[in-house]
Amino acid sequence: MKGSDIPHVEANYVDLGRAVGTVCDNAHRELANVLETLPSTPADVAKKQALLEVLVRARQEFVRTYVLTKWAKVSEDVTKCIDVVAWLHGQRNCFDNLNHMLVGLGRDLGAAKSRNPDLQTAVQVLTRGAPTTFGDHDMAPKKKLKPQTILRTLRDLNVLLSVQLAQSTDIPPQFKRYKIANGRATFTVANAFEVDVGIADDTLDGPFFFIDFRLLFGDRKELPPQTRGMLERAGNSALAQRGLSALYSLLMKFALNYKLALIYKQIMEMSKGLWSGTLRHRFYQERSLIALEYWVSQHATHRPKSTLEIGIFSESDLRIAVRWSRQGEEVPYSEHQIQFGGESTDVASLLEYVTTLHLKHIISCVYTKLRALLGDSSDMVSLCSDGHKLRFRLTSLRSTVFTVDRLTGKTVLENATSLILSAERSLNELVSRPDQAASVLFKLRLLSLENDIRTRACATGWTAQNVTLSTDEMKTHFGFTTRYVLFLRQPQWPSNWFVVVTVPEDGSLPLWWIAKLRVRKDTAWTAECMDRIHVNQDLDSLYDYELLTQMVTFASHRIVLHPILDELRAAKTPFRLLRSAQHTPVVAIDNSALVTSWSHSSLLILPEMSAGSMDMKLHVQGRAKTVMNLPSNDSIDFDASTGIYKLTLEGANTPGFSLVNKLKERLQQIEQIVSYIELIKDLGLELVTASMQQIKFKLGDAQVSVDIPSELNPNITLHLSPTDPHNIIHSYLQETLNSSGLRPVVWLLQTTRNLYTTLQKLQKTRGGDPEQLEKIISNLSISDLETRQKQLQPRLSIVPRSAAFVRLVYPGKMNIDVTLVRHSATLDGVKFFIKESPLELPPPPQPGQPPVAVPRKLQVWNGSVTPDVDVGKAVYLNDGIACEGDNVGKVLEWVDKQIGK
């Protein structure tokens, strides 16, 4: 006959993968810890000893793990061996128990005596040494029941039970599920128990009595006889007093407490296994409550605890429920929805589910708090897909992963560095709430960012300085949100200039400043100048050699530009600091106070420093509103296609250099040239050449040039061609140019050209041409000059009194005045008045002398003499003639002809 199989042991088994992972995590953690502490160990021998101890322990653990993996290949044999050992221990316990039972039986048989009146049995014992039959003294003989009687009785009992249960009003809802068979009613409560009850008589209101009881959970073994007897007595008493409701309450409490005992047994076994040192538990039997505290290594005396209370919490609702307190705060059922104590009583699964929820809660709270702290820079923190880890960017190249060990509750930060390990210790030693964890991680971000910038800057030639600013200075310049300040400088800079890096409270991006400081008497520093440097950066920016080199270039230029910026502020000239593509500062000036209308209101000033020195020149760039084609030179450059002009100012770093004065001088010079060019274009004249020194244009057939004031020639000068008839009034034109500008000069040249051309012609005709007279005189001797003195006197002299008033002197005859009058801006408003000016009367003749003839007066003024040529529109005024500019020459020629008659 084949025996039954050996029972299989399933308790205290751990997955091989989980065990291997735990060994690897512990080895990594110990190795990281010893590597972190090695720099603080002074002796090399001690360092080697500490490292060797860690390696030996790790090797022992990995050897054990290797043995386990070898066993895993023959897992069936090993499992069978474990089952055999467990079965042998069980058999030994059985024999031990049998021995104890036999001893107890021998002790109890002393009271097992036959009654004295049973003489028959006594005689048998006396004669034969033992009774030959069971005694039936005073006993009525039993009648055997027929099977038909038994079946009929059972059917009757079934009918009576059906009727009685149908009429019963005190059946609890949990007993609505029942079946009737074999003369008994069986009530089943799912995942709890089954109970059989029967009736003692055939009355419809007779009481029920307890028959049998079975548990529907655990190993479903028979209850011990003592427990069963106690339960039967209590059940019959409850049925007799209060019916089925009392029976349900009694049996349900018993089943639930029995289940709690089995649950507590699991907890005790778990405390000896993988969860050792992480659980604290207690069973309150009088309250039907198990208090299970997890992550006890994280719970100091002053910190709130995380507990699971498993038990019966209501007499009206008899069931096992779970109440979860997470770090001292009860978690509502709607959040966790834990179903435990019914179908599932696996405490390991319950703990795994709860710790997973707790882990997700911590991760979610830390994530929310970090996003609130980071503000717009929330891309630095992200959740992993499973929600069990949080990735946090510390710098552009470094990040860490925040999570919690579900077994111990300790915080773990991956990608370890010295700062990250320090933060991990702080999280495990000091932190009790997720908001504190977020603050520690946020501080780690700030420290990592500051340390990254400091390390890279020092590696690229910068020096970090310990500068102490007062609290008021910090608040004034950096605000209340600045957490860390780093002072950097270059060795070649002046000692009081620094680049300041501030890390704001939100930890998003560092702010860069250029600062000029001075030391106060109390050794604290104060800022004379603190300007923001706008760096094109984002979360992916690298604070590498390229960026820091660009910062050196920008800051060096900015330091040299500082006196110029102070001058602009003092002159109340609006400006903005920009940054060029070559990473140098660019000053954008509002030049509305420097120029009027010819240029746009913005000027860009680009500094250029010589390599290896502090010498600097300034390139000023602007744009004219109208495109000009002006020639360029060493100090100014014009782009005829775009209208952009560029100025170069030398010696910007020399003492006494004034940017405002230099700009005013250069821009006014350009403005004057531009105004002249626009004037010439407006007047419809032809521009011949234009430069920064001179502008030349055509006026009729003649060319007129104007010298522009400059540093070498501070005066504006008008130049006429040698044959220009206006040379006679050049001094008056120059005076008008100095006082009123070029427009009235051009107007005079245009308006009076007919007049002075005619005057030049008349002068040549009457022998008043200076060149012709000079030629004649040069060919005569002194005696001829005396003889021809009267003959050589000019018959016409032109005497200009101003640019608009000229007198024609006819010696011995008369004077003619020509006056230009402008009544309005229209062409009709310009008139020439030609009139006869009275001569001075000769003195009265001396006695004996003939009387002097009185000069005659022309008769042309009153219109009595008709012109023999077309003089155009002329108005006779009795004492003169008014005519237009186009006809003034013809009128003068006609008047001259009348004078010559």
Swiss-Prot record:
It is found in: Nucleus. Component of the Mediator complex, a coactivator involved in the regulated transcription of nearly all RNA polymerase II-dependent genes. Mediator functions as a bridge to convey information from gene-specific regulatory proteins to the basal RNA polymerase II transcription machinery. Mediator is recruited to promoters by direct interactions with regulatory proteins and serves as a scaffold for the assembly of a functional preinitiation complex with RNA polymerase II and the general transcription factors. One of its GO terms (biological process) is regulation of transcription by RNA polymerase II. Its main location: nucleus. Component of the Mediator complex. Belongs to the Mediator complex subunit 14 family. Keywords: Activator, Nucleus, Transcription, Transcription regulation. The keyword Transcription regulation applies. The keyword Transcription regulation applies. This is Mediator of RNA polymerase II transcription subunit 14. GO terms for cellular component: core mediator complex; mediator complex. GO terms for molecular function: transcription coregulator activity.
